[in-house]
Amino acid sequence: MTTINSEKPTSSDKAPPKMPGALPLIGHMLEFGKNPFNYMMKLRNTLGEIGEFRMFHQRMVLMTGPEANEAFFRAPDTQLDQSQAYKIMTPIFGKGVVFDAPPDKKDQQLKMLMPVLRDKPMRGYAQIIVAEVEQMVADWGDSGEIDLLEFMKELTIYTSSHCLLGNEFRYELNEEFAKIYHDLEKGVNPLAFVFPYLPLPVFRRRDKARARLQEMVTGIIAKRAQKPEKSEDAFQLLIDARYDDGSRLSPHEITGMLIGTIFAGHHTTAGTAAWTLLELARRPEHMQAVLSELDRLFGADGEVTFQSLREMPLLENVIKEVLRLHPPLIFLIRKVMQDFHFKDYTVKAGKYVCTSPRVSHRIEEIFPEPEKFDPERYTEARQEDAKPFSWIAFGGGKHKCTGNAFAMLQLKAIIAVLLRRYTFELTDAKDHYQDDFTQMVVQPVSPCRVRYRKRQTMSDTATQASEAGTAEKTPTGESFRIVIDRELCQGHATCMSEAPELFQVDDDGNLTVLQENPALDLLNKAKQAEKYCPTQAIKIQLK
């Protein structure tokens, strides 16, 4: 683990090297704004794993690579503050909500939403997502063309709102909610990081949409209060939630947290789903391999279920490779509240530090031939992502995206259903499809057109691969040890579903290991818990 120290300086205590070429007043903003990724890659190639640049008056320090990422993600909030860095979201989430709330209040708010992302409800989301995809393609016919990104944006609004927000947003407020969400989404752009309240049309529409959504939320709360039965969704969770002092959430707070929920479930997933099909369409050999995996798993009439979605190693590796090359968030930011030390360098309080998944994912020493699309990087034979904090598409540490399991479930379900029915081809040259860096969340440049064709052949005799001969041999020994990284554990309770004899998670998300030295007959269950833990907080050690 990389050593950081928020109190004592290192022996050298020198400032990070600075990027040359800063212009008066605007610093490096012009070059950064043209293409943030190219600029950050240039900084890494020029200065190494840590270096400083300037955006207007803000001094930023970029840290990349596994060691730098670990220092960044494991730093305490008192030293590197996530909330102070994301004031850009205050106009959207609202005053006093999530990033604008004091640390203790923010932690309470985030904990209120955790139950909808736990393992038990997750098992029901698979069928909802499958049904939504099937409904979207019901009238496609044998062939046609679509704007893939726009299709995925519409689809993931439906899947996310249906799974997480409730029926009112999915069915009753469909068109108006989609318009409101679009205006909120457009309000998140790089300019808002520096000047979030400029009197620009895009920001005026953002604020108007936020106010209208709060009106809608207030109305739904009143209607739900008249119903004897309660819904089981994030909305109802927030209506019923209480702070530690017993007070309820206000409609203003509920609105902001619902926006945060849908942003997490939709904002990044649409682009990743589109890129997954684009990358497969670029490479027929990879497309065929994924189709073969799906045919073996489902045959002609097999049902896409929660369990089957967990057993798609090839498709999962394809998605991981897409997220390596096209992470939706190209940089993550923290404000330095106390001097931050990394190796021989000290970043003074008041500056900002950031890390870039996109840059870290292109370090050749970690990922050879980094620009090559190669899903086999993640196979057991290679494990190029084995080094901690090398693959950080979902962040890391205690602030790792709590919805990462939902995101992977949603992505695999969407791609699996689509590819069981259709194949996809590019309508334009391969290099036409590029990332759009004009928004804070990176997606393919629009329009993003593809051609679909109904699959004509599928092996009717394809069956799920036999497990014969693949079962793990029981190791020799007397017991094994379970190690929990408490900083990574977020209380998803997947481990409790897989091995209730070994793990217990309470309503607040606190994990208890029930047996310190379990017998070997529980090893396979423990390994399942380790395998499916969304945050990789569990490690099994044989004695």
Language-model features, listed with the residues they occupy:
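N-terminal membrane-proximal hinge/A-helix region immediately C-terminal to the signal-anchor transmembrane segment
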Residues: T2-K95, F99-Q108, R123, Q127-Q135, ...
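Cytochrome P450 proximal C-terminal region
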Residues: T3-I4, R44-N45, V133, T156, ...
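Cytochrome P450 heme-thiolate "Cys pocket" and heme-binding signature region
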Residues: I259, A264, F306-Q307, K343-Y345, ...
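Iron-sulfur cluster-binding cysteine motifs and their immediate structural context
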Residues: T494-D507, E530-K543
